From Swiss-Prot:
The lineage of its organism: Archaea, Methanobacteriati, Methanobacteriota, Archaeoglobi, Archaeoglobales. Possibly the antitoxin component of a type II toxin-antitoxin (TA) system. Its cognate toxin is VapC18 (Potential). This is Putative antitoxin VapB18. InterPro entries: Put_antitoxin. Belongs to the UPF0330 family. The gene is vapB18. Pfam families: VAPB_antitox. Keywords: Toxin-antitoxin system.
Length: 73
């Protein structure tokens, strides 16, 4: 299933530059999956507030530190 989205010309040009022979879907999927990008996109599209993202980042950092402490024992 395909969907049509509207993006500004400058964003389109950026995607074209990094796309190479990949599809736009592949590029966008890769960008969303990279660490931190999903939350940034959620803020950009207004589905999460900056405060929610900061709270999520703090919680993620705490979990990462806890996991590292388990590995160091």
């Amino acid at each position: 299933m395909t969907k049509t989205i509207s993006i500004s010309d400058d964003v389109y040009e950026m995607l074209v530059k990094i796309k190479g022979k990949r599809s736009f879907s592949e590029v966008i999927r890769e960008l969303v999956k990279k660490e931190g990008n999903f939350d940034l996109l959620m803020v950009a599209f207004g589905t999460r507030s900056e405060e929610e993202v900061e709270k999520l980042k703090r919680e993620m950092k705490e979990v990462e530190e806890w996991m590292q402490s388990l590995c160091n024992h």
